């Protein structure tokens, strides 16, 4: 067994990089490289020396030179014939390899008959180089490829005589394969390189990877020479190559993947006796084995194709980095292209075997080495290219057919299997036709087109095609292609899902093909109207799932099964720049007639949308349309609406004309305002088709999903049953949308307002003379009578629904305006409702009066004067009845009121309110308890209107008559005085609140003061009255009026201090600022007095600086001052004296605490010494008492630290250093307590 050529860590490296070749010429190369026998190698493996190895290397280099010379000569010969492999066997040359033994003797190996191998592949070129390491200092080269040559030898022939002394060859042989030459390091000489033709890989895409070919070439050459020794041998040579491929970074755009894998090739190379029998078999085995290894790489690399790099078909066939391509390149490219027709990859073995069966003889002649893939003969090249074109045309037709499918029918028995779960897209046939016009590779250009289609929001549809069914597909397609008319619902579905309606621009493909409504509808819709992208992909996805084609209806192409259109449309006139938008509920049913496979009978099936969906949709539409409806109702009160077909853009077929009652969907032409188009996402009619059996349900079922309709949407409904040329248009605007939404509330049914507004219902008409000429097959299809009848009923109900809320919206507007104007009124009414004595008639009067006040903001001065005078007279009459007051006293009371009340109107109002509410509890202390100030202020703030005055005055008289039967009038005077005291601050608050008519009220007050000022006699009477009131307060003290008494005592001063209180109330910051400073000073003074510490350190410093005489006098004076002070005052000098007597300790732990303890302790000692502070050390490791003190008072501080006295902790090392930096260490130690 021959396994390697390495001797004592020295490696024999064979490196074949690429060399270019020109033309399609093939060269023959006879190689005779004798190899020693197994026995000789095993016997002499320990005797191989360095010189022997040098000779072996020289022989190899000579062999390489011969190869290069033959390679150059082969370029000049030009093209050879295909049977060249048989001719070159007669022109074999003998190569003699001399191996020197340890003694230095040279033996010549006998020549043998060689089996020639075709080195006819021009794509790859192998450069063989040898390298030997003789110095121990040099590191061996890494060996990525290990070659194990196993020879099963049945004969006993040796290589040559005297091979006992042949130096042995060790087992492991390193053969390094690369694309660039490697220089030799032996004796600083450049290595000799030779070029020989390589073999192409069976992988059609990997044309530059030469590792496997070069290795096999180098091994097979040696095996050929070994087999030439004895032609009668019956032996099989097994070459086992364990390859670890290096990272291969290709320059080609198609392959960018790095791979490193271990691959094993078992190659059976027979001798010349049985080469004719086994060559074909070995080639097939090698091709299939290598195909298995290289297929995963091919699949992954094909996906990395960039569109910009896709060039012509010839460019893709040529291997990158080489000069020219050949038949093998074209054949391999074809395999790659055929692979793109499948979804999960291409079975390489199966197709390879087909090629082998088809051209086994040509492969045997042209590809004897067994490494390259099967190469077809030139006469079969045109046939294969024609087959390629057939595959391309077949693919174009299939893609065209795929894009016209309505939906993905998983139960269809057609040859195409649509995989909608993955990333699918509909490839337009023109783009693929452009792809193959350039004859580019299938996977390269097709993938780029699919990527181009992704910008339209569609998903790629991967089509799985089996080659066995290609003929059946073509026949089936030709039979059904011209008949089936389908809508591109998949494109619409994906367009709605991706929030866009994209129009596909296409030209007519052929006479037998019809461009269906999906794409052309989109293009015409883009020309006629501006389209807003519809949001809500979830709803469209749900609808599309149920929108499969009813195949049983396809078998009966009756009028009922013909394409139907359900029209729900309201025509809106030209609004004045309102945000009026139109949605078109396109409900289309196009049923293919040629579908053969039918499902269950679903004829009467009807998909109903949920009521919440309809309610939300109705609300959203009503929001946009309520205001324009109300405006139109005001202008045109007849209550009828004009429904016209002005925007109709297509021509009705004969079937649609017969069914004149059919309904058509139109796209209104309003370029000024944006539009929202709701498109049907499938051809299945269950979700939106109207059934004749349930005409009552139609009004609820035919709706646009709420998720696809924006809130700014108004609908237009058309009906073709009646003709009313004088019908009016209903205008739906956006200003009353919110009002209508509030009025409608949670009403979701479409017929909620139908019965109430029957006189206002629409007369829905169809004007056939306005229909323009367009093909309905391309646009919207044909309509049936049943759908039109049912849609008319639903449209009438929907139109009635939109009319009714308008009347209520008008009413609601007036109510809202009243509410906005009476916002303050309602708040006041709510406050008044909380009062105990407020009844319903009174509340009604208050509301009426507030309305009057808001309407007439300016009140005449005369009316104000009359009201004030009437209030005063009524108040005087009440007192006259109760206490029999005389006329002079009435004059005094009147003068007093005029003087005290600055704001006459509000004062009179609040005075009587306060009098009522405070007098009643004042007279009934036994029942209700005490009348607190909080209750009085609350009631005073709530009663501020004029309407309450009359009611309160009447109640005053009644209450006083009932309650104060046995009491004196003085009690009433007390309550009057009480109310005066509380009245002024409350009136000021009311003045701030009431800003309307304030200027006029002030004028009225001034006029009243001028006219009603009393004489001096009246003023004296008022003062006398006040004195009497004070006496009466003392008499009534038993009535338990604590708060009332305290307020009444302060009453005489309220007149004088009223404005002062108001000024302080207006400017509280100024008054409080001074107080704050005073408070701060007072607090600091109190704090110092509590401490009773006097800082006399400065005085002591001065004493030391003065002379002795001066110091004595000052000390005496200071001592006198100190004697004058209290004895409990402590000075800082005393504190210092006491602290200086205490010892200072440095607490440390010399035995523990880490390596920082000693330097920190030394730092503390240095600081204390510099500040002239005596100290001593205390070791916590040995002093238990010090340890207890530190644990108790340190609070987690780290050692070392400074402690004064027994347990007065000054600080640890950090705090001491900070104090030292601030020059406060002595103060910290001695001046602190």
From Swiss-Prot:
Q: Where is this region: Disordered?
A: 1-39, 65-116, 160-211, 250-577, 594-825, 851-872, 902-955, 984-1071, 1109-1128
Could you tell me where the Acidic residues compositional bias lies?
Answer: 466-478, 855-868
| Residues in Glutaredoxin domain copies | 1132-1233
Biological process (GO) annotations?
Answer: positive regulation of actin filament bundle assembly
**Origin: domain of life:** Eukaryota
Q: Which UniProt keywords apply?
A: Phosphoprotein
Phosphoserine PTM positions: 180, 462, 523, 975, 1037, 1046
Which InterPro entries does the UniProt record give?
Answer: Thioredoxin-like_sf
Feature: compositional bias, Polar residues = 201-211, 329-345, 409-422, 728-739
Per the record, GO CC terms? cellular bud; cellular bud neck; cellular bud tip; cytoplasm
Asked if Phosphoprotein is a keyword of the record, the answer is: yes
Q: Could you tell me where the Basic residues compositional bias lies?
A: 72-83, 183-199
Where does the record place Basic and acidic residues bias? 250-280, 287-300, 349-370, 379-408, 484-497, 508-527, 594-622, 631-672, 684-711, 753-783, 910-920, 935-948, 986-999, 1062-1071, 1118-1127
Gene3D superfamilies with a match to the protein in the record? Glutaredoxin (3.40.30.10)
Sites of Phosphothreonine modification? 861
Misc: Present with 704 molecules/cell in log phase SD medium.
Protein name (database record): Uncharacterized protein YFR016C
The species this protein belongs to is Saccharomyces cerevisiae (strain ATCC 204508 / S288c) (Baker's yeast)
């Amino acid at each position: 067994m021959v396994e390697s050529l390495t001797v004592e860590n020295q490696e024999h490296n064979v490196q074949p990089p690429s060399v270019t070749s020109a033309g399609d010429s093939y060269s023959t190369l006879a190689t005779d490289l004798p190899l020693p026998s197994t026995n000789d190698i095993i016997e002499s493996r320990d005797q191989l020396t360095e010189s022997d190895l040098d000779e072996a290397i020289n022989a190899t280099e000579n062999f390489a030179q011969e190869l290069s010379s033959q390679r150059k000569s082969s370029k000049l010969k030009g093209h050879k014939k295909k049977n060249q492999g048989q001719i070159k066997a007669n022109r074999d040359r003998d190569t003699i390899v001399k191996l020197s033994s340890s003694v230095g003797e040279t033996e010549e190996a006998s020549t043998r008959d060689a089996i020639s191998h075709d080195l006819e592949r021009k794509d790859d070129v192998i450069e063989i180089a040898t390298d030997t390491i003789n110095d121990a200092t040099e590191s061996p080269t890494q060996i990525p490829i290990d070659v194990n040559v196993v020879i099963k030898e049945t004969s006993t022939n040796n290589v040559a005589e005297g091979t006992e002394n042949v130096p042995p060859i060790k087992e492991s042989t390193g053969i390094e394969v690369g694309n660039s030459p490697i220089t030799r390091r032996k004796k600083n000489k450049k290595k000799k390189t030779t070029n020989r033709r390589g073999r192409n890989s069976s992988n059609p895409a990997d044309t530059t990877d030469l590792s496997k070919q070069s290795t096999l070439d180098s091994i097979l050459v040696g095996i050929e020479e070994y087999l030439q020794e004895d032609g009668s041998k019956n032996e099989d040579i097994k070459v086992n190559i364990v390859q670890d491929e290096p990272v291969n970074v290709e320059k080609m755009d198609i392959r960018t993947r790095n791979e490193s894998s271990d691959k094993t090739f078992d190659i059976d190379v027979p001798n010349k006796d049985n080469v004719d029998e086994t060559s074909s078999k070995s080639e097939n085995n090698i091709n299939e084995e290598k195909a298995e290894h290289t297929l995963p790489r091919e699949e992954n690399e094909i996906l990395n194709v960039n569109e910009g790099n896709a060039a012509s078909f010839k460019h893709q066939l040529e291997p990158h980095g080489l000069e020219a391509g050949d038949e093998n390149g074209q054949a391999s490219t074809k395999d790659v292209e055929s692979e793109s027709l499948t979804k999960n990859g291409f079975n390489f073995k199966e197709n390879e075997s087909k090629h082998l069966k088809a051209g086994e003889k040509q492969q045997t002649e042209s590809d004897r080495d067994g490494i390259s893939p099967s190469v077809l003969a030139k006469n079969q090249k045109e046939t294969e290219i024609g087959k390629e074109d057939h595959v391309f045309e077949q693919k174009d037709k299939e893609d065209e057919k795929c894009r016209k499918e309505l939906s993905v029918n998983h139960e269809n028995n057609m040859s195409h299997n649509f995989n909608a779960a993955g990333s699918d897209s509909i490839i337009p046939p023109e783009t693929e036709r452009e792809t193959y016009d350039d004859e580019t590779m299938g996977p390269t250009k097709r993938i780029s087109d699919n990527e181009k289609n992704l910008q339209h929001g569609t998903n790629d549809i991967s089509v799985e095609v089996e080659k066995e069914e290609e003929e059946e597909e073509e026949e089936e397609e030709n039979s059904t292609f011209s008949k089936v008319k389908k809508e591109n619902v998949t494109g619409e579905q994906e367009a709605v899902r991706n929030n866009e309606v994209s129009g596909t621009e296409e030209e007519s493909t052929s006479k037998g093909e019809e461009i269906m409504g999906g794409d052309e509808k989109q293009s015409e819709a883009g020309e006629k109207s501006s389209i807003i992208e519809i949001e809500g992909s979830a709803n469209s996805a749900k609808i599309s799932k149920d929108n499969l084609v009813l195949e049983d209806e396809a078998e009966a192409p009756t009028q009922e099964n013909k394409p139907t259109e359900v029209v729900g449309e309201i025509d809106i006139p030209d609004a004045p720049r309102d945000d009026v938008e139109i949605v078109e509920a396109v409900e289309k049913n196009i049923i293919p007639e040629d579908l053969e496979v039918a499902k269950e009978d679903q004829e009467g099936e009807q998909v109903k949308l949920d009521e919440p969906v309809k309610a939300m949709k109705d609300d959203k539409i009503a929001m946009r349309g309520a205001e324009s409806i109300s405006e139109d109702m005001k202008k045109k009160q007849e209550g009828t609406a004009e429904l016209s077909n002005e925007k109709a853009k297509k021509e009705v077929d004969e079937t649609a004309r017969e069914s004149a009652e059919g309904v058509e969907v139109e796209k209104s032409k309003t370029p000024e305002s944006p539009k929202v188009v709701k498109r049907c996402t499938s051809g299945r009619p269950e979700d939106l088709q109207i059934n004749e059996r349930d005409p009552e349900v139609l009004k609820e079922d035919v709706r646009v999903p709420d998720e696809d309709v924006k809130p700014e949407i108004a609908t237009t409904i058309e009906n073709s049953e009646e003709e009313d040329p004088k019908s009016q248009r209903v205008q739906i605007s956006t200003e009353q949308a919110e009002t209508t939404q509030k009025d409608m509330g949670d009403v979701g049914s479409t017929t909620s307002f139908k019965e109430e507004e029957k006189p206002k219902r629409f007369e829905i008409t169809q004007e056939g003379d306005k229909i323009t000429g367009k093909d309905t097959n391309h646009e919207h299809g044909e309509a049936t009578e049943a759908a039109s009848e049912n849609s008319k009923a639903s449209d009438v109900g929907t139109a009635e629904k939109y009319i009714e809320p308008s009347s209520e919206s008008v009413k609601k507007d007036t109510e809202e305006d009243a509410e906005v104007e009476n916002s303050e009124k309602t708040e006041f009414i709510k406050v008044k409702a909380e009062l105990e004595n407020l009844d319903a008639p009174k509340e009604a009067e208050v509301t009426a009066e507030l309305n009057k006040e808001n309407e007439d903001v300016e009140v005449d001065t005369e009316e104000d004067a009359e009201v004030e005078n009437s209030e005063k007279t009524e108040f005087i009459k009440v007192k006259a009845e109760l206490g029999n007051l005389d006329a002079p006293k009435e004059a005094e009371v009147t003068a007093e009121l005029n003087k005290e009340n600055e704001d006459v109107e509000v004062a009179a109002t609040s005075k009587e309110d306060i009098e009522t509410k405070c007098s009643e509890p004042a007279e009934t202390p036994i029942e209700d308890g005490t009348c607190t100030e909080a209750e009085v202020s609350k009631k005073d703030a709530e009663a501020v209107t004029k309407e309450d005055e009359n009611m309160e005055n009447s109640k005053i008289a009644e209450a006083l008559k009932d309650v104060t039967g046995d009491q004196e009038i003085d009690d009433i005077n007390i309550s009057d005085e009480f109310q005066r005291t509380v009245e002024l601050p409350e009136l000021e608050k009311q003045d701030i609140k009431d800003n309307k008519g304030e200027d006029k009220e002030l004028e009225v007050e001034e006029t009243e003061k001028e006219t009603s000022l009393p004489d001096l006699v009246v003023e004296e009477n008022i003062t006398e009255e006040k004195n009497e009131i004070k006496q009466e307060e003392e008499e009534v003290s038993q009535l338990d009026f604590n708060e009332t008494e305290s307020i009444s005592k302060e009453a005489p001063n309220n007149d004088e201090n009223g404005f002062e209180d108001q000024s302080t109330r207006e400017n509280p910051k100024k008054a409080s600022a001074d107080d704050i400073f005073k408070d701060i000073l007072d607090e600091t003074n109190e704090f110092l007095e509590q401490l009773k510490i006097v800082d006399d350190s400065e005085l002591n410093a001065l004493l030391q600086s003065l002379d002795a005489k001066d110091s004595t006098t000052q000390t005496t004076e200071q001592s006198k001052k100190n004697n004058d002070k209290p004895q409990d005052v402590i000075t800082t000098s005393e504190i210092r004296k006491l602290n200086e007597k205490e010892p200072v300790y440095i607490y440390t732990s010399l035995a523990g605490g880490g390596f920082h303890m000693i330097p920190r302790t030394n730092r503390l000692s240095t600081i204390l010494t510099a500040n002239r502070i005596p100290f001593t050390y205390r070791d916590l490791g040995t002093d238990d008492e010090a340890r207890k003190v530190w644990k108790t008072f340190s609070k987690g501080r780290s050692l070392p630290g400074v402690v004064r006295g027994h347990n007065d902790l000054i600080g640890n090392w950090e705090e001491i250093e900070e104090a030292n930096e601030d020059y406060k260490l002595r103060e910290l130690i001695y001046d602190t307590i």
